Amino acid sequence: MSSVPGPTAHLEASETATVRDLREGYRRYHPSPVTLILGALLLVALGYLYVDGFWMRAHGVDLAFVALIGALGLLGFVLSLITSRPSRLPRAIDVTLGLCGAVFAQVLTRELGVPVLVAVGVTGSIIGVLSLRDGPLDFMASASGYAGMFTGLLQPGPVLAWGWVLIAGLLAGLLMSVVGPAVLPGVGARIGAVAFLTGSVVYLLAQWSGTDSPPLLPVESAGLASWAILPIGMAGALVTWVLIHRTSMPFVLASALPSLCVCGVMAIALPASVPVLGSAWVGGTLIASAGPERLPTAFWIGTAGIVYGALMLHFGGPLTGHVGVLGATATIACMATAAAEWLVHGRHLGPLVARIARAPATPSR
């Protein structure tokens, strides 16, 4: 896998790096217009989700919490965007895997009647096994397949033809291929953000073409009024993080295989709670894809998991069940937590510059 130089790749890993160093690095390795456009699209999608799903329904103390996380999330987005890397052309294998992931998930859920969260675990586990060392898939190909799998949970039927699902899978693979190594590097759960953006685009295209409002992902996420989602979201993030960093398990496999096991146990022991608690776990696992330059320790990964769970406690509105909502919310939690970590330990741009300079300039996260 070829390296993609970052905006600070020429800097030494020095904690004394300055704002001037960052400006110089940005001028030398500035993100391409495509990178900035994709970043803006992600910001619009995440902003719409946050305002419609959280801000408009918060009051009192909840509103203060949502405002704080929103401000931190915006700061985290800015810090991530200015350290984004030049974009590259999409790879055919990434686009193909996005399509295959969507088709496979669609066959499992709609043709074979497999429960949604089980389909997520099965599809992701297969993709993850293929991305093991010496396997045929690298990280970006497996991530594209995972993103396509989430978009494949769009429901076809009388008002949404199979063709829209195929378009969603192709778009997810295409976007992930370009976003992965370039846009918001190191930010966790971008797979979910890409799935949410892709699902939104397909939803709008279907409406503009005269199709009635298409059904959405049938995972109930409104009114997650069980505080159990806080520890479950944190546990999902931490278990996945440990598997990645202690056993060198590929991210997609580390996310999907435990999700399959956990949701299977829940289906036996607590069948009525699977949609809520299982969704909390799956969304939490996506946080573990954050790079160490953003969330460097297990403490910050766990904190992002708690923030994610706290956000989902207050989610509601017309976007309930929209493809990628859980992952997009996890992305917001990652950016907010990364900004908090930077404020606590950085206080200026120097340490962030040094961290990005030390981070491998490869699409590993």
Regions found by a protein language model. Name each.
Residues R110, H245-R246:
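Short helix-coil junctions and helix-kink-helix linkers
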Residues S3-V4, R85, R365:
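Compositionally biased regions
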Residues L81-P86, V103:
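Glycine-rich, hydrophobic membrane-spanning regions of integral membrane proteins that mediate transport
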Residues S2-T16:
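Short, charged cytosolic
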Residues E12-F77, L89-L99, Q106, P115-A119, ...:
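C-terminal transmembrane helix-loop-helix hairpin of multi-pass membrane proteins
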Residues G121-S125:
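Extracellular loop-to-transmembrane helix junctions
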